[in-house]
Amino acid sequence: MKILLIDEMHPSIVKMLEKENHEVTYSPQITREEILQIIPDYHGLIIRSKTPMDRELLDRAKNLKFIGRAGAGLDQIDLDYLVTRGIKLFHAAKGNRDAVGEHAVGMLLALMNQLPKGDREVRKGIWDREGNRGHELAGKTVGIMGYGNMGKAFAKRLQGFGVKILAYDKYKRGFGDKYVKEVSWNKLKQEADVLSIHVPLTSETRGFFTIEEL
């Protein structure tokens, strides 16, 4: 099977595929135009998120059997058209959940304590003690919209901060436990001091989080 890798990957994946007698082309710097020219010759495609897998590209991939996504996000892939074409999709849904959970906590702490603003000002010789006072997380209510792998990872890391955690997921029920309370979307909006959004960008979620909605 001929497999094309179009993004930076760990070198071990090439050796692993070649060991299984696949013909591998590793081209992390390839452009979209170049992909369109050569993709008809390939049976497999391994990607990250640089190049959209849209109908134009997929129509050129006449012999494509599968796409392997090295990561969790699928917003750059036309999932419906993959089904129509019968192209299989593999992705690492849990691959970066710990990193995302930690990153989300770091961003929350930075925002609550005005660290980005304070950092910029101190670098300019400005010391605004009162203007940059932060807010403790303890006692606050954190709302999580979307309780998949990333939402759960974030909730797990919040448990030591003395916060109340509420979560809403349109497609899941019965996930509440002693740390996380499952609530409706309206209740989440009404009670949360902080809202953390953990849903993919899809036709359903694009443009959903407006000021009016929140």
What are the language-model segments listed below?
Residues 150:
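Hydrophobic/small residue at the entry helix of a nucleotide-binding pocket
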Residues 5, 142-144:
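Hydrophobic Val/Ile/Leu positions in short beta-strands of Rossmann-like dinucleotide-binding domains
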Residues 51-57, 166, 170-214:
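Rossmann-like adenosine-cofactor binding region
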Residues 2-4, 12, 20-25, 97, ...:
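Structural/interface elements that position substrates and couple domains in central-metabolism enzymes
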Residues 87, 92-141, 153-156, 160, ...:
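Phosphate-binding beta-alpha-beta segment of Rossmann-like dinucleotide-binding domains, i.e.
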Residues 24-30, 48-49, 121-130, 175-182, ...:
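Short gly/ser/thr-rich secondary-structure transition/capping motifs
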Residues 82, 104, 125, 146, ...:
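Conserved hydrophobic/aromatic pocket- or pore-lining residues that grip, position, or stack substrates
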Residues 1-90, 188-190, 210, 214:
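An N-terminal-biased, well-structured beta-alpha scaffold segment characteristic
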